[in-house]
Amino acid sequence: MTKYWIGTVSQEHVLRGVAGGFCQVCHGKATPLNRMKRGDWLLYYSPKIRMDGAEKLQAFTAFGQVTDDTAYPFQMSETFIPFRRNVDYAETRRNCPIDIVRTHPEWKKYAAMLRYGHFEISRDFFDFVRTYMQSPPDMVGQQQGFW
């Protein structure tokens, strides 16, 4: 059965993952990544633009489907070898700001969990964010019922 997940990662790191077709969460730990199975969906939430920066973003920034079976190590530097999973990212038209997501009935349950870095969500919540991210700007709110 397909599961849906959120990963909390800076936008800068999300963009690297999208460009490279991979995901990393929780500072490169393997355990959270191995909770996901091939065919599961990952939705990235980015609280900030850069991991060590102060500029807030607070938006969902990418989503994609896991395409492999297990986490694998990847040497980024001599001293940092994080684990990754391969992901086929979907095309999006825009980020989904947190103000939009706050209107979803499950938001309160998930908001407090964002600090954990990786957790399972419902398909309904995933589809809500996905629809916003893939809708043309003039369609959002009018025909999708967002506001």
Where are these regions (language model features)?
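Short, charged beta-turn/beta-strand-edge "cap" motif at the junction between a beta-strand
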Residues: 46-52
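Short His-Asn-centered micro-motif
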Residues: 8, 45-46
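Aromatic- and Lys/Arg-enriched surface recognition patch
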Residues: 56-124
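Short, conserved, surface-exposed binding loops centered on an aromatic residue
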Residues: 33-36, 54-58
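Compositionally biased, charged N-terminal/linker segments
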Residues: 1-38, 108, 133-147
